[in-house]
Amino acid sequence: MAFLPNLVATPMSLASSYSKPVTLGIIGGTGLYKLGALTPVAQIDIDTPWGKPSSPITISETKSGFPVAFLARHGVNHDLTPTDVPSRANIAALKKVGVKAIVAFSAVGSLQEEIAPRDFVVPTQIIDRTKGIRPSSFFEKGFVGHVGFGEPFDVALGKLVAEHADKAFDNSKYKIHTKAKAGKDLTLVCMEGPAFSTRAESQLYRSWNGAVINMSAIPESKLAKEAEIAYQMICMSTDYDAWKEDEEPVTVEQVVSNLTANAESATGVVEALLEPLEKALADKSIGYDLDGSMKFAVSTAPAARDATVAKNLDFLHPGYW
């Protein structure tokens, strides 16, 4: 489903390499494979120790020449289930091209009446309801490390996104929901999928003060933290999940219809964010505070560290250990 114009061209028409660091990455979810306001200049095929990413990395430039790396989370043809998304390869590939900040788009179900279908949400917290079958760390047996996850989304990046994305809804009947407007954290529940929630599950998540639910935030956000990349998700509401007693449970047809409508809003959000993100990355007010944080995260004694895992981690953080 290619709802937004002018990002992904055919590999034959684009360069296969790009020499400059690309500090901004955008991960697109369902219905968001292409972005407006950008000119594609390269499409890079990257191999990582964790395999290939979901799609080639497409590098596009703004009119000022600012480069942006785009990755299709579920594959160009949407052939990867949420469980099968190679998140470690995705984050590692973005890290390899120089990304310091990621803005990730995702379709979500709403768990609250005030978050209507086609509204957007900038979440601040996560409840992990995945099943532990997705690799959620670059660290493995023989090379143990721990990362703080009290703030699953980057606070500075989240504030920038919330402030500037709001402008895209100035003349819209839809809204963007932020912590500043709500006066409280907006919690994203991440479930395994690919089936949607039962009504009982959906009501349970509401009782936990969940705001929205998706299948993508975990392990993407955890891996970005380990990669020392600032990460913020922007959620696009497609439905009321299954909690509303007076409505039929969500259907795929309903989701796809709202995905199409959300694409136009997403284009406006991206256009509103590009200039402030370029400025913030240039002056290092976002994307750099995590630098070096993983150097001291390892618990395993040097003599006991697994050589293969160490080599893999060197791809991510050269010279750290």
From Swiss-Prot:
<dbReference type="InterPro" id="IPR000845">
    <property type="entry name" value="Nucleoside_phosphorylase_d"/>
</dbReference>
<keyword id="KW-0539">Nucleus</keyword>
<comment type="subunit">
    <text>Homotrimer.</text>
</comment>
<keyword id="KW-0328">Glycosyltransferase</keyword>
<feature type="binding site">
    <location>
        <begin position="239"/>
        <end position="241"/>
    </location>
    <ligand>
        <name>substrate</name>
    </ligand>
</feature>
<keyword id="KW-0660">Purine salvage</keyword>
<dbReference type="GO" id="GO:0005634">
    <property type="term" value="C:nucleus"/>
</dbReference>
<dbReference type="GO" id="GO:0005829">
    <property type="term" value="C:cytosol"/>
</dbReference>
<dbReference type="GO" id="GO:0017061">
    <property type="term" value="F:S-methyl-5-thioadenosine phosphorylase activity"/>
</dbReference>
<keyword id="KW-0808">Transferase</keyword>
<feature type="binding site">
    <location>
        <position position="30"/>
    </location>
    <ligand>
        <name>phosphate</name>
    </ligand>
</feature>
<feature type="binding site">
    <location>
        <begin position="106"/>
        <end position="107"/>
    </location>
    <ligand>
        <name>phosphate</name>
    </ligand>
</feature>
<feature type="binding site">
    <location>
        <position position="215"/>
    </location>
    <ligand>
        <name>substrate</name>
    </ligand>
</feature>
<protein>
    <recommendedName>
        <fullName>S-methyl-5'-thioadenosine phosphorylase</fullName>
        <ecNumber>2.4.2.28</ecNumber>
    </recommendedName>
</protein>
<dbReference type="InterPro" id="IPR035994">
    <property type="entry name" value="Nucleoside_phosphorylase_sf"/>
</dbReference>
<comment type="pathway">
    <text>Amino-acid biosynthesis; L-methionine biosynthesis via salvage pathway; S-methyl-5-thio-alpha-D-ribose 1-phosphate from S-methyl-5'-thioadenosine (phosphorylase route): step 1/1.</text>
</comment>
<dbReference type="InterPro" id="IPR018099">
    <property type="entry name" value="Purine_phosphorylase-2_CS"/>
</dbReference>
<dbReference type="Pfam" id="PF01048">
    <property type="entry name" value="PNP_UDP_1"/>
</dbReference>
<comment type="function">
    <text>Catalyzes the reversible phosphorylation of S-methyl-5'-thioadenosine (MTA) to adenine and 5-methylthioribose-1-phosphate. Involved in the breakdown of MTA, a major by-product of polyamine biosynthesis. Responsible for the first step in the methionine salvage pathway after MTA has been generated from S-adenosylmethionine. Has broad substrate specificity with 6-aminopurine nucleosides as preferred substrates.</text>
</comment>
<dbReference type="GO" id="GO:0019509">
    <property type="term" value="P:L-methionine salvage from methylthioadenosine"/>
</dbReference>
<feature type="binding site">
    <location>
        <begin position="73"/>
        <end position="74"/>
    </location>
    <ligand>
        <name>phosphate</name>
    </ligand>
</feature>
<dbReference type="InterPro" id="IPR010044">
    <property type="entry name" value="MTAP"/>
</dbReference>
<feature type="site" description="Important for substrate specificity">
    <location>
        <position position="197"/>
    </location>
</feature>
<feature type="site" description="Important for substrate specificity">
    <location>
        <position position="252"/>
    </location>
</feature>
<comment type="similarity">
    <text>Belongs to the PNP/MTAP phosphorylase family. MTAP subfamily.</text>
</comment>
<dbReference type="GO" id="GO:0006166">
    <property type="term" value="P:purine ribonucleoside salvage"/>
</dbReference>
<keyword id="KW-0963">Cytoplasm</keyword>
<feature type="binding site">
    <location>
        <position position="216"/>
    </location>
    <ligand>
        <name>phosphate</name>
    </ligand>
</feature>
